[in-house]
Regions:
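GNAT-family acyltransferases
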Residues: 1-115, 178-179, 186-192
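Conserved catalytic-core motifs of GNAT/GCN5-like acyltransferases
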Residues: 143-146, 163-180
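Conserved active-site tyrosine of GNAT-family acetyltransferases
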Residues: 157, 162, 184
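Structural motif
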Residues: 39, 132, 136-137, 159-160
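Solvent-exposed, non-membrane alpha-helical residues enriched in polar/charged side chains
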Residues: 37, 63, 67, 131-134, ...
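Conserved GNAT acetyl-CoA-binding A-motif
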Residues: 135-145
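Amphipathic alpha-helical recognition patches that constitute DNA-binding helices
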Residues: 23, 35, 106, 124, ...
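Conserved acetyl-CoA-binding loop-helix of GNAT-fold acetyltransferases
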Residues: 112, 118-132, 151-159
């Protein structure tokens, strides 16, 4: 059971959640559905994010999924990541299983289009979300998981200060191969953002 404090300030009104490249924003299910549907149908992008869709997603089903994310449980906060330059949706990031008693939450994210990978969006999304988690939610620890084959993500997480906390052996079955899942975490005093 988690105690629910008063809601923190919205990133929409707080410039601390705007970087040089992206800003955290509220998800707009109507406006964001097309980009989200295209990402959901990209087997490479969804695989790296840990999703394995079993059906194609059209605009309407994407809108419905995004509406579910907006109405997420009290222990979840999801954001859209939009470019500062032209307000284009480039990804999504969220804090899940927020536990205010123990002071921890799980971080999950994806940069949607492969053309946007390696441009610094994911790094900045993570820094802004960690700033929100540690400064607004007053969390002590943020953790995440990734599949062991996602070496690019693990390198980024390590550069940002996440530390390896463990592995779930052969946790993921993908294309006939079993992969470990990697658990990484960061404590508030390890955050440099």
């Amino acid at each position: 059971m988690t105690a629910e404090p008063a809601p923190p300030p919205s990133p929409e009104t707080n410039l601390r959640y705007r970087g040089d490249l992206v800003r955290l924003a509220a998800i707009d299910p109507e406006a964001d559905a097309e980009v989200f549907a295209a990402w959901f149908d990209d087997p490479v992008g969804t695989r790296l994010a840990g999703f394995r869709p079993v059906w194609p997603m059209n605009r309407e089903s994407a809108r419905e999924r995004l509406e579910e994310w907006v109405k997420a449980s009290p222990g979840t906060i999801n954001f859209a990541a939009r470019t500062v330059a032209d307000d284009r949706l480039v990804g999504g990031i969220g804090l899940m299983d927020i536990n205010h008693i123990d002071g921890n939450a799980q971080l999950g994210l994806s940069v949607y289009r492969q053309d946007d990978w390696g441009q610094g969006y994911g790094r900045e999304m993570i820094v802004l979300a960690l700033r929100y988690a540690f400064n607004e939610l007053n969390l002590h620890r943020v953790w995440l998981t990734t599949s062991a084959f996602n070496e690019r993500a693990m390198k980024l997480y390590e550069k940002l200060g996440f530390r390896l906390e463990g592995r779930g052996r052969e946790h993921v079955l993908l294309d006939g191969t079993r992969w470990d899942i990697v658990y990484m975490g960061m404590l508030r005093d390890e955050f440099e953002g």
